[in-house]
């Protein structure tokens, strides 16, 4: 699967939009997410949806890389190559599937 500009990646309630892409890399910037409600009866897990084009800053990336974008190498561990991922430090960013992203606030 080819990644193209405008594609959205997610990780635990955080969203990132692709601004440039090649066959092996993607340059991403963080975008805002909107709170959609609780995902469990106790209120620990929260659902978020992305707001495409509303760029913001991300503490994981830092201010400078948030503004100009961060280039990351694409990975795909599936046999048919249809689930691209980006690795940013220890975080794995998966291509957003359209479902709300779940952020677990229970620590």
Predicted regions span which residues?
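Conserved "cap/hinge" positions at secondary-structure junctions
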Residues: 11-13, 30
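Short coil-to-beta transition motif at edge beta-strands of beta-rich domains
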Residues: 1-11
